[in-house]
């Protein structure tokens, strides 16, 4: 019997190719055109997207990207490549490809890369610890579209999420402990997750429950009292209600109430990116300190730390 050759596809959101208005516009157009992300009627959405949002947002967002851009590219791309390379070293018998839902490298190029390695089984690991239709669902949709055009389809194992995975929770807990040891234990640990429209949750997306699961498990692993850990949601877009409480409004409220020292972690981000390094580490720091807070530290994403790579290796090992 022929032995199965398994490959790994690491999937993430994506990034512009450069911190320029043109590159950001291309990226945002693809991202905001996905019905998994924005499901508004196309008749209403296309004119708004092309005539208002892209022309106005692209130059402003490009400046934000420029403020965090690294020598090797955007932070998300740099850390994602490091994850890919480290996991390939950890599992040398399994080819590892990186694909993004939007931008380059595409999910299609990642699938083709693995098929060129003659794999007959692909383990797909979307690097979103908490499932959402707008992230993991988008990976599923694109993967199905890609494979629908193939004459031969490999076996697929699709990891839905890992919100309560033991290795993931331990890696987060150790990262928090290291931050506490460096900066002192704060008055409050704030866990900020990317938001989604409240309507998506009302219609069945269990993302908020998965975020609560991670929050509960992490607080338990740290032995912290529930009142010392708070869960919020960031990066809202548009006018309709998103999951609450909002991170920025919560930080303002806490500063005004006299909370002096806060540390913020974003457990839903497997790699640091614009939303963590600029929005959380910079913008929201200013919000908290401006409202009266005294100390504010951002705890980095797990990125390509050894514990994170070991977690990924253990996660996919069951499917090899």
UniProtKB/Swiss-Prot annotation:
The text of the family note is: Belongs to the ferrochelatase family.
What is the protein named? Ferrochelatase
The UniProt gene name for this protein comes to hemH
The protein's job, in short, is: Catalyzes the ferrous insertion into protoporphyrin IX.
Q: What class does this enzyme belong to in the EC scheme? A: lyase
Q: Name one GO cellular component term.
A: cytoplasm
Q: Name one GO biological process term.
A: heme biosynthetic process
The main place the protein resides is cytoplasm
Q: Where in the cell is it found?
A: Cytoplasm
Alphabetized, the UniProt keywords read:
Cytoplasm, Heme biosynthesis, Iron, Lyase, Metal-binding, Porphyrin biosynthesis
Query: According to its UniProt record, what is one Pfam family this protein matches?
Result: Ferrochelatase
Subunit text: Monomer.
| The EC number(s) this enzyme carries | 4.98.1.1
Q: Does the entry feature the keyword Signal, yes or no?
A: no
The annotated phenotype of a deletion mutant is: Cells are sensitive to visible light (which is lethal).
Any one GO MF annotation of this record? ferrochelatase activity
Pathway the protein acts in: Porphyrin-containing compound metabolism; protoheme biosynthesis; protoheme from protoporphyrin-IX: step 1/1
Q: Where does Fe cation bind?
A: 194, 275
* InterPro entries xrefs: Ferrochelatase, Ferrochelatase_AS, Ferrochelatase_C, Ferrochelatase_N
Superkingdom, according to UniProt? Answer: Bacteria
Keyword match Lyase: yes
